[in-house]
Amino acid sequence: MEDLLTNPLIIAAIIGIISAIFGKKSKEEKQNSQKRKKPQHVQSASPQKKQSKEDAPAPIPNRMEQARREAEERRRETARNLKGLERDLAAAKQKTVYTKQKMLQVNKDTVVQGIVLGEVFGPPRAKKPHRTMRPARKN
């Protein structure tokens, strides 16, 4: 029993189980309170709907004009966003082209330096093993 209480994994598991149990209860209470609040909002909104139905016939042309304005505004915003995206895409393409050109730039000095370093370091040990290892492999 003492070993169980000193093991941190078991203690963490017990704490997790307890918190899960209490967490479920609090979630259920929140859901119940939200369900109770919703019907109250529906009742208070119904008189407003009745009033708006009486006023509704007059502003129909205004609604259409407003909808048209909103659609036009969304179209303009979409066009602005599209132009911005096109600029970003063009900049990204130019950047990739620039990096490719930069990677492919090879001048005489870098080629000579690469050849010299290749000769200095020589072939890898796997291709040219040490002398002491050759007899051991043959056996």
UniProtKB/Swiss-Prot annotation:
Residues 65-87 have a biased composition (Basic and acidic residues). InterPro entries: YqfB (IPR016788). It is found in: Cell membrane. The chain crosses the membrane at residues 3-23. The keyword tRNA-binding does not apply. Disruption phenotype: No visible phenotype, no effects on FloA or FloT membrane rafts. GO terms for cellular component: plasma membrane. It is a single-pass membrane protein. Residues 62-97 form a coiled coil. Keywords: Cell membrane, Coiled coil, Membrane, Transmembrane, Transmembrane helix. This is Membrane protein YqfB.
